[in-house]
């Protein structure tokens, strides 16, 4: 989500993406400069896109710069990498990338899980199998994936948008004119 990143007492509202190392095998993210230390658990390191680095630091290299996040202004984060950005029309926009932290509590719903299926696997059959899974959770009546939605990534933006988009009357008029 959007976070206020602080540098030299100036706030920059930026989009954050928390990932694990498998994201590099699924998505086209390149480390252009620096290291992948931002993927280490508890490293306090982050990666920044070229566009965000230009906005915050101008032509200076961002590597090694310490920044803060507004919700934790006493513990610095160190920029250790510059990464490529995606086109702006994406469900997963980002200015900064950091490591997602595992949450082993059942029912935790702070993450989206993306799965890459092999070419010969039916997405419908996969979704049916997952929906029928019952997970044995100690001290509970088991747990089932009730709100499971399987959507091809290419259709996600249209079928299940992540952001709550507010459509204004002007949008309706523009689409009516365009059609």
Regions of interest found by a model, annotated:
Residues 166-179:
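Hydrophobic alpha-helical transmembrane segments of multi-pass inner-membrane transport and secretion
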Residues 10-18:
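Active-site loop of classical SDR/Rossmann-like NAD(P)-dependent oxidoreductases
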Residues 37-41:
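Glycine-rich loop motifs involved in handling phospho/adenylate chemistry
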Residues 17-33, 46-167:
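Mid-to-C-terminal secondary-structure elements
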Residues 14, 42-45:
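Short, surface-exposed beta-edge/turn micro-motifs
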